[in-house]
């Protein structure tokens, strides 16, 4: 699945940086197919790491979207805003939110932990439709030019939307070999 369709906010150079980021043993990746409960899980992880103290304006300060171009300044170098957010929100511990596949993420033996969140496919499909429909012009789903729910659902089933087929994404993650570093929710 190396040809995974992505949002326009993720360039090939950013995806390469994502894969080559040097890991720390304390890194946490909150992973999912879009609209599967990532934000909910980000909040839980932040509460655990901060002992319940909410010291941020938005959860993305604690767990930024990993594959966004603006979060990188060069090859495998996180932007100063991401580094500052981690320092402020997590005491320097790095937490990321991502929809990339297991095979696209940095890995090293005994380094980092990966939480994979799964939600019912039917719930995900409708939630993703509503989410992308609200982002017309930003890589979202334009109902006026692309069609409504029926057209979106067909594209979702065939994997012609960002992050591809839901079932293939889940299967890819569930078949990952390094299970000791991965927790499914």
Task: Show which residues each predicted segment covers.
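PAPS-dependent sulfotransferase catalytic domain
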Residues: 1-184
């Amino acid at each position: 699945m190396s040809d995974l369709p992505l949002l326009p906010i993720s360039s090939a150079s950013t995806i390469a940086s994502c894969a080559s980021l040097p890991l720390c043993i304390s890194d946490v990746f909150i992973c999912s197919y879009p609209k599967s409960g990532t934000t909910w899980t980000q909040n839980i992880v932040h509460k655990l790491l901060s002992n319940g103290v909410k010291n941020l304006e938005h959860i993305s300060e604690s767990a930024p979207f990993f594959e966004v171009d603006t979060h990188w300044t060069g090859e495998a170098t996180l932007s100063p805003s991401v580094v500052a957010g981690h320092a402020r929100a997590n005491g320097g511990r790095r937490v990321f939110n991502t929809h990339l596949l297991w095979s696209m993420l940095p890995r090293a033996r005994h380094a980092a932990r990966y939480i994979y969140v799964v939600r019912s496919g039917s719930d995900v499909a409708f939630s993703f439709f509503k989410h992308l429909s609200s982002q017309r012009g930003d890589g979202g789903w334009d109902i006026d030019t692309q069609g409504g729910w029926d057209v979106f659902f067909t594209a979702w089933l065939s994997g012609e939307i960002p992050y591809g087929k839901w079932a293939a994404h889940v299967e890819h993650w569930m078949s990952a070999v390094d299970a000791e570093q991965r927790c499914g929710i």
